[in-house]
């Protein structure tokens, strides 16, 4: 019995000594992300969130999770949830405006949920009207639901002077 107690106590001491700090978990996640060890990076960032919910690194970890889930097209809903937490819980953080824009972008371009995309872009423009990405948000709003070819056609066809419509094309012989 006493051997069991000593073993359990020894394991507890070992576990408590091996707990990484929030900074170490952050750096570990960054290193794993750079090495393309995506699952390991996600685990490190998630550990940071779970073990250090008050850490100043939380919004950065949330953004990193969102970025990984978005760029690897692994889990778009998880990316949106991560970005939403930044916007809701850390509205003054440096990544908040970008997170808000990306919510709209993912709803529009990945999930094809135009209503949610519209709400997100409008929220972005209301919160960040002078942000450098505001023009992109307005463009996205103006073109919700259009396929890329339609948008390219709109941007490449010259407008007839004063009409707001593209001129009819004529073929010369």
Protein language model regions, located:
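Acidic, polar-rich low-complexity tracts and alpha-helical solenoid repeat scaffolds
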Residues: 5, 14-173
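Sec-dependent signal peptide recognition
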Residues: 2-8
């Amino acid at each position: 019995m006493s051997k069991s107690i000593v073993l359990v106590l020894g394991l507890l001491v070992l576990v408590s000594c091996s707990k990484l700090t929030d900074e170490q978990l952050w750096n570990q996640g960054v290193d794993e992300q750079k090495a393309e060890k995506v699952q390991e990076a996600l685990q490190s960032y998630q550990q940071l969130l779970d073990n250090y919910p008050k850490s100043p690194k939380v919004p950065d970890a949330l953004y990193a999770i969102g970025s990984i889930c978005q760029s690897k097209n692994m889990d778009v809903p998880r990316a949106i949830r991560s970005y939403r937490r930044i916007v809701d819980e850390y509205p003054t953080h440096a990544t908040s405006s970008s997170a808000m824009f990306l919510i709209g972008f993912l709803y529009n371009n990945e999930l094809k949920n135009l209503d949610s995309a519209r709400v997100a872009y409008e929220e972005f423009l209301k919160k960040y009207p002078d942000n450098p990405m505001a023009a992109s948000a307005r463009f996205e709003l103006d073109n919700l639901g259009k396929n890329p070819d339609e948008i390219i056609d709109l941007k490449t066809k010259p407008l007839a002077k004063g009409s707001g419509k593209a001129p009819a094309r004529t073929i010369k012989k």
